[in-house]
Amino acid sequence: MRITISGPPGSGTTSLARYLAGKHGLDLISAGEVFRQLAKEHGMDLADFGKFAENDPSVDRMIDARQKEIGEAAENIIIEGRLSGRMVGNADLRIWLSASLSCRARRIAGRDGMDEEGARAYTENRQRSEATRYRNYYGIEIDDLSPYDIVLSSETFGVDALGTIVDAAIACLARQQAADL
C-alpha cells in the first residue's frame, strides 16, 4: 500500500507518518526531512533555504522527483511531504492534515525552540515561499485539496486519534483491494 501524507508546516504530517509506518511496518520517506538536511548542508536555516529554493528550482525538483520515484516504485511505503499527494501518481491513499496557523506556530515554536510570535512569522513566510514555488514550478495551488482522499484536522484530533481514523481507511482499502483480486 502507498500512502501519502501532506499538510502545511506544523500540521503533524511527520508525527502521523511515523505513527503509521511503525504500526503497519511501512517504509517512510519524508520530503521535509530531506529539505531540512539540505538546508543544514548549505549552512542555512529553513527560511533562507526556502528563499534560495525560490531562485533555484533544482532544489524542489530534486526532492519531488526523488519522492515520486521512490513512492511509485515501492509497494509498502508512506511518503510524507507537502506535494507527495500530487507527486505519487499511484498512491492508494492521499491524506491532508490541517490546523490553524496559531496551533501550527505553537507546535513549531516548541519543536524548534522559538518564541511563538517568531514561529508564526517564520511559518507565514515559509508558506508564502512554498506557495510561490509550487505555483511557479508546477502550476499547483497548494490550497486546492481536491487530490486528497481524506482531509483531517490535527488541531481537533491528536496523533493517536488521527491514526485510528487512518487505520480504518487502510482496513477499508485493504478489503477493497482484496475483493478486486
UniProtKB/Swiss-Prot annotation:
It is found in: Cytoplasm. ATP binds at residues 7-15. This is Cytidylate kinase. It is an enzyme of class 2 (transferase). Pfam families: Cytidylate_kin2. It catalyses: CMP + ATP = CDP + ADP; dCMP + ATP = dCDP + ADP. HAMAP family: Cytidyl_kinase_type2. It comes from Methanoculleus marisnigri (strain ATCC 35101 / DSM 1498 / JR1). InterPro entries: Cyt_kin_arch (IPR011892), Cytidylate_kinase_dom (IPR011994), P-loop_NTPase (IPR027417).
